[in-house]
Amino acid sequence: MEHTYQYSWIIPLVPLPVPMLIGVGLLFFPTATKNLRRMWAFISILLLSIVMIFSIDLSIEQIDRTSIYQSLRTWTITSDLSFEFGYFIDPLTSIMSILITTVGILVLIYSDNYMSHDQGYLRFFAYMSFFNASMLGLVTSSNFIQIYIFWELVGMCSYLLIGFWFTRPIAAGACQKAFVTNRVGDFGLLLGILGLYWLTGSFEFRDLFEILKNLIYNNEVNLLFVTLCAFLLFAGPVAKSAQFPLHVWLPDAMEGPTPISALIHAATMVAAGIFLVARLLPLFIVIPYAMNLISLIGIITVFLGATLALAQQDIKRGLAYSTMSQLGYMMLALGMGSYRAALFHLITHAYSKALLFLGSGSIIHSMEAIVGYFPDKSQNMVLMGGLRKHVPITKTAFLVGTLSLCGIPPLACFWSKDEILNDTWLYSPIFATIAFFTAGLTAFYMFRIYLLTFEGPFNFCLQNYSGKKRNSLYSISLWGKEEPKPIKNKFHLVALLTMNNNKRASFFAKKTHRIASTVTNMPFITIFPFGAAKTFCYPHESDNTILFVMLVLVLFPLFVGAIGIPLNQEVIESDILSKLLTPSINLLQQNSTHFVDWYEVVKNPTLSVSITYFGILLAYFLYKPFYSSLHNWNILNFFAKRGPKRILWDKILNFLYDWSYNRAYIDAFYTRSLTEGIRGLAELTHLFDRRVIDGITNGVGITSFFVGEGIKYLGGSRISFYLLLYLFSLLFFLIFLFFFFFK
């Protein structure tokens, strides 16, 4: 086992050959590299599988010994300046490595089929492998220098992946927005690192924590400056994990391919911020104001993300705001000092959200066969409905992920979220109230997504389907607002062209579908308008590769929660996760008893589960009945009658809808105050530079030209006149200096 630790430095290096070889191959042997493109997918999966086995071996060693291994190499620049580079293996590293590799492998297998039609197939796998290598380097870093380097590499890879389809203006704008927003947090992180180095003289985590702790306890440092450094450090995770107020990039990141969304929102990029806060928790604990700020930002993000998800019509944007809210739960747990609960929820949420995003990718693929390759239609839940009849396997997998994320026992997220909710009562009743209420909102918006997608008729061809219907309850079921762009009467169905039989595009399916490179070369079929009685075809189930990945991911929400369930009633830390994290930081349960009371285990979740079921029933009542025969019941018509109270209720609902659909107007505020303000300042600066600075320079030149021409005219081009003028000017200058200095 000691050899496993000694060779842990290769973990971030194993996936690196893929992007390097693909780049060299495309540069020197483009034809051969493209013809062997599926070989690169296989190599990517194989290398990441090696890292996964390595990580599992490290985790087993951590459970048996609970040891921490650190290896350092010193790079001496001068006699006074040197840096230490190495790797750091502890339980947190083991957990993150397993998350990155397991989710990464499944996403790569999924992408082999999902991206088979795309001309950027090789570029996609090169980006993905480099992204995984950067994340693995981040979690194994032993000091601030290394972690900042890999932090920036992760940001660069996310920029490339979000803007993968960079020819689309929306995708190009989304990757720029993500990049700029994260630059704000990264600048704060850099300033915080430099400030702590100035205080402690070290970049190493363990040395820095010990030195800073002694300085604070001995009152040898300015506490205000230390708090400022901690706040600046926290700015990095706030941006990377999409916490308020730097959360605005996350929904726009959905413009990338769906496998990217699964990877970014599950176990990698957004989890990097949670990882860094967990890594620096010993530093934040000795600064009370820092812990308060972390918990405050967490609870705001929990509630804000849930409310913004209520009215989203794009299925991926709804899941993105769900991710934002769940990351807020993790940040809240870390701010409360509940280290174990935060990491537990990080694990359970990663697999559940990966399942949901990959399920949404399967749905989008199915819808593209009907509406064509138009993301604003294929991802629009308003145009879906009734898919449970056509994609039953996807529906089952999506339902499992939805139930897990809602916190329904005994699925995975129930155990982790309930632990966080119980800890909030010990920390703050106000925070607990908000957290429990948001748990109900989570159940509501997740089942809203599920019901709009899978239940009822297929809305794309529903007769007279639009927001123009005046039935108030019908409007509530769709959050009652039309798309800003009118729906055209005719659509063109993009024909899916099959590849040659000797070119298999997935590991399991014998054939795949390719989308033609240009619309003009595509055969198309005109679909009847919405008023038609039937359409040409209905959505179909995805290929076997996509279904296989989803069925494997279904196992994780079913069973991964077991790692946090106590196995022995006599010992409170008898579960696998506690053994792995022992000794761990848990400020809220330091005085807890050393045995498990199963009555308390059953009683404590009662409130949270009740709120969750209420949210599910509310979503079911608002969305499900209007697609059934209950729509014509007199009781519904009774509730739909207009009156003063009804009008007030509609105004409240419309306000909530507008507030949620428009992202709480935060993006608009940033656009007006920051983007347009900076552009206005830039235009003003440009105008000042052009009119004033350039005017002075050009004015001096023009004045010199005319003076020279005047002298030339007066002198008649005679050299003697020029010499005489020069002598008189020199004499005048000397007289002026004499009287000015010696008067």
Curated annotation (Swiss-Prot):
<feature type="transmembrane region" description="Helical">
    <location>
        <begin position="607"/>
        <end position="627"/>
    </location>
</feature>
<keyword id="KW-0813">Transport</keyword>
<dbReference type="InterPro" id="IPR002128">
    <property type="entry name" value="NADH_UbQ_OxRdtase_chlpt_su5_C"/>
</dbReference>
<dbReference type="InterPro" id="IPR018393">
    <property type="entry name" value="NADHpl_OxRdtase_5_subgr"/>
</dbReference>
<feature type="transmembrane region" description="Helical">
    <location>
        <begin position="219"/>
        <end position="239"/>
    </location>
</feature>
<keyword id="KW-1278">Translocase</keyword>
<keyword id="KW-0618">Plastoquinone</keyword>
<keyword id="KW-0934">Plastid</keyword>
<keyword id="KW-1133">Transmembrane helix</keyword>
<feature type="transmembrane region" description="Helical">
    <location>
        <begin position="425"/>
        <end position="445"/>
    </location>
</feature>
<comment type="function">
    <text>NDH shuttles electrons from NAD(P)H:plastoquinone, via FMN and iron-sulfur (Fe-S) centers, to quinones in the photosynthetic chain and possibly in a chloroplast respiratory chain. The immediate electron acceptor for the enzyme in this species is believed to be plastoquinone. Couples the redox reaction to proton translocation, and thus conserves the redox energy in a proton gradient.</text>
</comment>
<dbReference type="Pfam" id="PF00662">
    <property type="entry name" value="Proton_antipo_N"/>
</dbReference>
<comment type="subunit">
    <text>NDH is composed of at least 16 different subunits, 5 of which are encoded in the nucleus.</text>
</comment>
<keyword id="KW-0812">Transmembrane</keyword>
<feature type="transmembrane region" description="Helical">
    <location>
        <begin position="546"/>
        <end position="566"/>
    </location>
</feature>
<feature type="transmembrane region" description="Helical">
    <location>
        <begin position="280"/>
        <end position="300"/>
    </location>
</feature>
<keyword id="KW-0520">NAD</keyword>
<dbReference type="InterPro" id="IPR001750">
    <property type="entry name" value="ND/Mrp_TM"/>
</dbReference>
<dbReference type="InterPro" id="IPR003945">
    <property type="entry name" value="NU5C-like"/>
</dbReference>
<keyword id="KW-0793">Thylakoid</keyword>
<dbReference type="Pfam" id="PF00361">
    <property type="entry name" value="Proton_antipo_M"/>
</dbReference>
<feature type="transmembrane region" description="Helical">
    <location>
        <begin position="9"/>
        <end position="29"/>
    </location>
</feature>
<feature type="transmembrane region" description="Helical">
    <location>
        <begin position="125"/>
        <end position="145"/>
    </location>
</feature>
<feature type="transmembrane region" description="Helical">
    <location>
        <begin position="354"/>
        <end position="374"/>
    </location>
</feature>
<feature type="transmembrane region" description="Helical">
    <location>
        <begin position="40"/>
        <end position="60"/>
    </location>
</feature>
<feature type="transmembrane region" description="Helical">
    <location>
        <begin position="721"/>
        <end position="741"/>
    </location>
</feature>
<comment type="similarity">
    <text>Belongs to the complex I subunit 5 family.</text>
</comment>
<feature type="transmembrane region" description="Helical">
    <location>
        <begin position="89"/>
        <end position="109"/>
    </location>
</feature>
<dbReference type="GO" id="GO:0048038">
    <property type="term" value="F:quinone binding"/>
</dbReference>
<feature type="transmembrane region" description="Helical">
    <location>
        <begin position="396"/>
        <end position="416"/>
    </location>
</feature>
<keyword id="KW-0874">Quinone</keyword>
<dbReference type="InterPro" id="IPR001516">
    <property type="entry name" value="Proton_antipo_N"/>
</dbReference>
<feature type="transmembrane region" description="Helical">
    <location>
        <begin position="185"/>
        <end position="205"/>
    </location>
</feature>
<dbReference type="Pfam" id="PF01010">
    <property type="entry name" value="Proton_antipo_C"/>
</dbReference>
<keyword id="KW-0521">NADP</keyword>
<dbReference type="GO" id="GO:0008137">
    <property type="term" value="F:NADH dehydrogenase (ubiquinone) activity"/>
</dbReference>
<keyword id="KW-0150">Chloroplast</keyword>
<protein>
    <recommendedName>
        <fullName>NAD(P)H-quinone oxidoreductase subunit 5, chloroplastic</fullName>
        <ecNumber>7.1.1.-</ecNumber>
    </recommendedName>
</protein>
<dbReference type="GO" id="GO:0009535">
    <property type="term" value="C:chloroplast thylakoid membrane"/>
</dbReference>
<feature type="transmembrane region" description="Helical">
    <location>
        <begin position="147"/>
        <end position="167"/>
    </location>
</feature>
<feature type="transmembrane region" description="Helical">
    <location>
        <begin position="258"/>
        <end position="278"/>
    </location>
</feature>
<feature type="transmembrane region" description="Helical">
    <location>
        <begin position="327"/>
        <end position="347"/>
    </location>
</feature>
